[in-house]
Amino acid sequence: MTRATQTLLLTVTGAVLVRMAMGDTYLRYVNSWMRWPLLACGALLVLLAVVDMWRDEPKADGQPDHAPDGEPESSHVPRAAWLLFVPSLVFFLIAPPALGAHFAERAQTAVVPAEPSTEVVLPELPTTDPVPLLLEDVIIRAAYDGDTLADRRLEITGFVSRDASGDWFVTQFGMNCCAADATVMKVLATGAEAPADDQWVKVVGRYVADTGVGGGTPPEVTVEDVQLIDAPTNQYR
């Protein structure tokens, strides 16, 4: 790999990071708070490439730089370094989507401690009907105090995933940093035909008592209405 190729690699990688962070694409792979670090890293890589090109220009006398032994200066980089272009090419050619149903079937499910270290006090639900809840809120309430969900119509949002038996779930991924550490949150939906996998839905239903207790299994909701919706810009929690 020549010096010019290394400079090109810096430029392309930096441009990819800047392009991702300037739009919403980065939200498929990392948390929203990482936008500015991505922009800074991308800009720094482009700046390094510009500086490298400036330093590599011929001298005023037109003579190239020479190494101490009199041989022209060259860079000896392993051919494997060409693999560094692969992530950039993948982004430009494919742009992988956010994690979806296929990964949800195999991912680690978010675990709620069966016995919390401190007493869990859950606030009363709003009086709206149906009451909109995040999947994580349904999971926590079912695990620790399912009575707070009793006799209430819940509105939950997520994408459709299935398990090996064919049951379907309203699903969403939560992540701390990036897609690599994502955990899946899901609520079992019964009483209605499943939409297509990966389809985002808004489901209205009632919590099935004594499901999801202790956080070992997903809570269950008897579906009253399913509305197909567009995927949100940020598909993670």
Where are the regions a protein language model picked out?
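OB-fold and OB-like single-stranded nucleic-acid-recognition modules
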Residues: 1-237
